[in-house]
Amino acid sequence: MEKRIGTFYGVSVGPGDPELMTLQAVRRLENCPVIAAPQTPKGGMLALDIAKGAVELSGKTILPLHFAMSLDPAVQKAAHIEAARAVKEYLDAGQDVAMLNLGDVSVYATFGYLQEILEAEGCKTVMLPGVTSFCAAAARLGQSLTGGMEQPLTIAPGRCAAEVLAAPGAKVLMKSGRQLPETLAAMADAGLLSRSAMVCNCGLPNEEVWPDLTDYDPARSAGYFATILVKEG
């Protein structure tokens, strides 16, 4: 009899509000025996907390995944390999594993690194889409991301602001908190502060909304989950 190998699922939990999780995500988590989720050095597991708001997870095996915050590619890769190894132990035992991902699993998500490693080892992987932080932020602000069917939309990390602001169309600058002073300076140089808005921790209890960044103090911390929307100038 052929041995069953588990499937590795990348499950999107949305930006913060559990009500934004899809029915597909909820059902997959209900049926998956092992739930993997990133854990911070201080023990926080935000994606798991969000999922618990929509799914009863008691009785599940919770697998914390530790990812290095270092910018050193070698350090990052070592963390990805170690996380993939931990997941594969359950897959080899015939258990499905669902990895929780903030926002959508296809957008700046750690799942992709583990997916590449595990697929190379013959494991089956499946991605379940979800609501992105920038779509939720646009809805929170009550504004369209694009002004029309023909307008381009550029999505980039906040650290790339200086390079993308000159491009045509609207822009989304994700995870902008760490480089916020530099990002705001680039936007000021481009004359786009008055056409920009920011939502921090969208859908979470500590959510903050800034419809206009003209008077935002660059020294004020916005946190890691800061999403900036820039209308075309």
Task: Indicate where each model-derived feature is located.
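A contiguous loop/helix-start segment that scaffolds small-molecule binding in enzyme catalytic cores
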Residues: 8, 97, 165-233
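Short gly/pro/ser/thr-enriched loop/turn and capping motifs at secondary-structure boundaries
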Residues: 42-44, 70, 132-135, 204-206
